[in-house]
Amino acid sequence: MQIVGDHLAELIPQGGTILTQCFGETIIGTVIRAARRQNKDFKVFCAETRPYLQGARLTSGCFAQMGFDTTVITDNMVAYAMEREGIDLFTSAADTIARDGHIANKIGTFQIAILAKYFGIPYYVTGIPDQDKHSKDDIVIEMRDPQQVLSYRGIPNTVPEVKAIYPSFDVVPPHLISGVVTDLSLIHI
């Protein structure tokens, strides 16, 4: 996976600003190491990634502890950050990459990809294509416990009569993706 980190780090402009979504444990570590080897410095904005807050709890800490200027934003601040904070590149890992170019990643990735396209910001996905997933129709979206949306750390954030849904992933169509960074190369879509 270090090769994936190397390829992704090459896409990040020196002194630039990137936006991340969720926490791709392996790729975060490899891109940080690659950026350090390439003497690259850049700012990082991490979407908090509710309801588990992987962006805030995990991704932001990795970048900050390695000396990158890191800022956490709530998931509903992405357009603001793209418009006013100089985001140069959006990146996420992919839980699934279908052979037709659709990807599945943590819920919220699709809306960020739409905003990136609107603002002309390239979106690069990291991962390995799934040979058994031919199209978006082969991607199954797991529904998780909606209680995780209705409370935070055991404290309810709404009244008991309110319901919630929690799809774990959403699917991003290939026309919103600039490229897929794999262990072999950068595949432009």
Could you describe each region identified by the protein language model?
Residues 105-111:
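Charged helix-capping and loop-helix junction motifs
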Residues 187-189:
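Conserved small/polar residues in nucleotide/adenosyl-binding loops
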Residues 79-105:
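Active-site/ligand-binding-proximal alpha/beta "capping" segment
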Residues 1-72:
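N-terminal active-site beta-alpha-beta segment that forms phosphate/nucleotide-binding
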Residues 33-38, 64-66, 83-85, 111-123:
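Alpha-helix C-terminal capping segments
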